[in-house]
Design a protein with these regions (language model features):
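Amphipathic alpha-helical assembly/interaction segments
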Residues: 1-126
């Protein structure tokens, strides 16, 4: 059976695809580091990570650029939250520099893509 979201327009957005990949990286990292990252922090990290593609998708499903922008700003805020949490984990020795580098590179890419999408949406009339 084909998913009703298989052809959803948000799936065409590179920002969504890369943020989904970031969320997968984060989930895998939290699973691998389950013994070093406490449960509460891991839950918060996962929530911030999954919020990014979720808000991009929801915003893209809205009818106006204004609505879409609101959700893109929320996605960008969640990305900032995630960046802060990963930085704390690295400085506390809860994750290794190699893990952090992969995630940091992906977060930077997602940030650029969200910024580009925000600029595009701002330039479009409702």
């Amino acid at each position: 059976m084909e998913s009703s979201t298989e052809g959803a327009p948000y799936r065409q957005l590179k920002a969504w695809a890369e943020s989904r990949d970031l969320a997968v990286l984060i989930y895998k990292l939290c699973f691998r580091r389950a013994k070093t990252i406490d449960r509460g922090l891991a839950d918060q990290i996962r929530r911030a990570a999954i919020s990014i593609p979720s808000n991009i998708a929801e915003g893209n499903g809205r009818g106006t650029n204004r609505d879409s922008l609101r959700f893109l700003y929320i996605a960008r805020g969640s990305l900032c939250e995630l960046e802060s949490q990963i930085d704390v984990c690295l400085r506390a020795g809860l994750i290794e520099a190699g893990d952090s580098r992969n995630v940091t590179d992906q977060m930077a890419l997602v940030g650029r893509l969200i910024g580009g999408l925000i600029s595009y949406r701002k330039s479009r009339p409702d």
